[in-house]
């Protein structure tokens, strides 16, 4: 019950912070995170971005994200945050590459092909590698890997979302959904 109350509090804080003004222009930070093309990627009609967001400078903790925008009307589509379960399963290696992402990896591992069931046809998908130590997310403090838990993971995710929304303010007023599987629901 306490965990649920804390999560509701964090979500209310996040909603309050996201109620400030937004801009539709691509920022310098966004441009730096733009993926022009992945190795072996087919031609696509949507934009992709990836990068790191620092969630704790003192410990050197940063979370990795990959945003795949919708190929049709991305400015009118909602934002969906995807979290894999586990805990400890990579959202990029599994959720994006094996389930709902725009690409599949061919059997030889030499190229990508389009996933005809990709969820980014209906929403802009934000894949988050969480907690630090999972996938491409990292910490420079080894003890963080031993002391990670639900509360710190939730706090880091909130810090990530607040900072990410500052980097991508055009998503502040969109419908926002959180989806995942297994332990991601915790």
Question: Where is each model-derived feature located?
Answer:
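Short, functional N-terminal and low-complexity linear motifs
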Residues: 30-32, 125-128, 158-162
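Phosphate/oxyanion-binding active-site loops and adjacent basic polyanion-contact surfaces
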Residues: 57-61, 146-158, 183-186
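N-terminal cap/lid subdomain of alpha/beta-hydrolase-fold enzymes
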Residues: 5, 66-155, 166
